[in-house]
Amino acid sequence: MTSYSPINVKQLSQSSLPQKHKLQTFSIDVDKLLKRHYTPFLTWPSWFQRLVSWTLRLIIRQDTVNKFLSENSHLQSFDFIEKAFDELCFNYHFNAQDLENIPAKGGVIIFANHPLGALDGLSLLHLVSLVRRDVKIVANQLLSNITPLAPLLLPVDNLKGDSRKQDLVNIARALEADQAVIFFPAGEVSRLSPKGIQDKVWDAGFLRFSERLNLPMMPIYIKARNSGLFYSIARFSSTASMLLLPLEMIRYSGRFQFFTSPVITPEQLAPLSLSRKEKVKLLRKHLYQLPKNKPPVFTTKKSLIHPQSRQSLRLELKSAEKLGSTSDGKSIFLFTPHRDSVVLDELGRLREEAFRAVGEGTGHKKDTDLYDAYYRHIIVWDDDLLEIAGAYRLGEVWKWCKQDESCFVASQHHFHRPSQGLYSESLFKFRDGSENGITNNISEVMEAGLELGRSFVQPQFWGKRSLDYLWQGIGAYIARHPKVRYLFGPVSLSASLPARARDMLVWYYQNYYPESHFTAEPRAGFKLSTSAIAEMEKLMDGSNPQKDYANLRDQLSHMQMRVPTLYKQYSELCHYGGVSFSAFNVDS
């Protein structure tokens, strides 16, 4: 468990960007707030109004608060929050994992319980800002009176139980701009109930935004409580207890701790035959389970590790071998990993992100394995955006095979360096010799071979020729190493494909691109069923690859599918007969 004081947290935060603001003075006026937001106040005798106002000014220390606001009117956003924390001697607690669960980019809806009041919102804004600065919070009109916080707020009129259309439009625009937006679904501070201190009934607004914009939701539970006096008064008067909240904030000295969960996606909720109200109840239950170490309501994938420092990536890639440049100014590098490599961590993060985007992925924080450390990586780097656009992993088998003996002796490799063998060997067994009329020249292939695999293109670079640029890099590598004459490696079919689409693809590529140079035996082989084979033989010509490929594409399009990019590219890369799909393995 890690505890952060305001000073510790401030050191982690980035400095606020300088902005041009007209200096404003602002203050809290209890009398005006009562007249504006508590209608019965206007019906009271004037002497009683003055008495109530005077009493509340003392309780909330209005003069002290206004002095602080006046002295710090030059501060904005997160700087103002940190100054307020210093003034209140306030700190909060969280685990390192809690911070890792916050998505570092992309639109996300953060929903939380609301135990205290303003401190909940300020601390949540501050916590999220440690990961990303593009965060806003849906807040009531009272909080929006504090001018320095205005850039962080999306005001709604919770007190009247009604939100203007423009308020909702502003929230949607923030989310569509890939910002993080914080919601308190209860709309008011938690109350004492038979089950303890809990929120009142949640509004479903945050779920509506998630469904409409197809955005993930991240739960954050806040473990904190107000004083016994507050809950006692709240039983009789919600308005009176609300007026006590400033005093509760000033006097707060209890423990304040965050518990977070990885995001919950709209796809997880869509199959549930439940009303929106019932789904909100499940989300609420999931949130309240977080501090109890109980099984969560929703199974979540681990959040991706946060992006590596852009400058660290750039510096590390400067030492890599440059293979070339693209027509639009990107650089192509051949990267050799080393211990504690930030580039390798970023490759693992982006690889997992890319595979999750198509319904796959390991479910881990990053997709790396033991082979990444001694394989090399072709990387396309965008120096304008400081982003890795995509990568291919290379196993330099032609270097690793000993020159004085076969690469394969009794099915065992003899390598200079990698004791773990090849990545493809974890999925297939290779054999020398003759089988099914095929002379297997595995040793010849390996001695001049380059293993390819684990390729990806970062989603924001899809459709921007990034895969072509990776092949430009592979071509440049082969030009520098003319001994390489064979390319081989695994290529995957998504598990999310309909069974019929999968069967059609396997049949087509087995039929027209059979094994030719060597036999690969799958460790967990995939076999077409008799009925699937019968259907394919009826559907396909069987001897005309162009005609059957057109048929394959048409059949896949009816299922809203298409031929996987790498299958299409590999088969088009060589003249007919120059590429084979030797075997199909089921990856566990």
Question: What residues fall within each predicted segment?
Answer:
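Conserved N-terminal entry element of GNAT/NAT acetyltransferase domains
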Residues: K301-H338
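Glycine- and acidic-residue-rich phosphate-binding/metal-coordinating active-site segment common to enzymes
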Residues: P148-L192, G196-L213, M218-Y221, A234-F236, ...
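Non-catalytic C-terminal accessory region of glycerolipid acyltransferases
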Residues: V30, K165-S312, A534-G542
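Membrane-anchoring hydrophobic helices of lipid-metabolizing enzymes
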Residues: T2-V108, H114, G121-S123, L130-R132, ...
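A short helix-loop-beta-strand connector motif used in the catalytic cores of GNAT acetyltransferases and
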Residues: L370-I379, K402-Q403, G577-G578, S588
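Acyl-donor binding region in acyl/amide transferases
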Residues: E352, T362, W400-G577, S582-N585
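Glycine-rich, often proline-containing surface loops adjacent to acidic residues and nearby aromatics
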Residues: A104-I109, L149-P151, V181, F259, ...
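Short amphipathic alpha-helix that is part of the acyltransferase structural core
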Residues: L323-H377, W381, E387-E396
